[in-house]
Amino acid sequence: MNVSKEKKAIVAGMVGCLLYVIGDFLFAAIGKNQSADSIGLMVKVAYLDMATWRMVLSIICGVLGTALYYIGFHQMWKLLKRHLSQPKQRKWVKMFQAAYLTGTVCWGYVHAMFMNVALIFKFTFVQYDDMRAAAEIANKVFYCNAAPLLASYILCDVLLSIVMLVLIWERMLPLKSTGQRILASLCNPI
């Protein structure tokens, strides 16, 4: 079976999305015997029991996911650019490009930031045996990074979702039925 480079790139983007989900699960999953308590906004007590390999694997999933996500989005942009040539459509293709480029970079950063907050909390606690102080340090690191987190959410999730919804509902994408448009609308980042 001969699969085109375009299809391979789109599949790579889907695999990247799956790696994000796996990385997020490794980061967020809490066992039955682990505490779900939080200290401050970002620190969970469960990070202390989380194996370091899970944190490292989550970071690797985020890095690989970002690269593959970019490949898929770049291919989608090339397809949109090729098929949408009217001036009104071009505006949305450019907005799609801006959203996926900035959003992909931001989400790679955000994933690493979340993991680093967990690692800072865990290793500060191990070193100094003071949970409150470790949580305070980790939360301060998060607060310093809150603005880029908000920017990444606005650029990647909100802007990309708006652009995709316009492309879907203004019938710029070749979706034949309302059911297909609804399903495509549900596959947005938000």
Enumerate the language-model features and the residues they cover.
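Hydrophobic, aromatic-enriched alpha-helical segments typical of multi-pass transmembrane helices
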Residues: 1-190
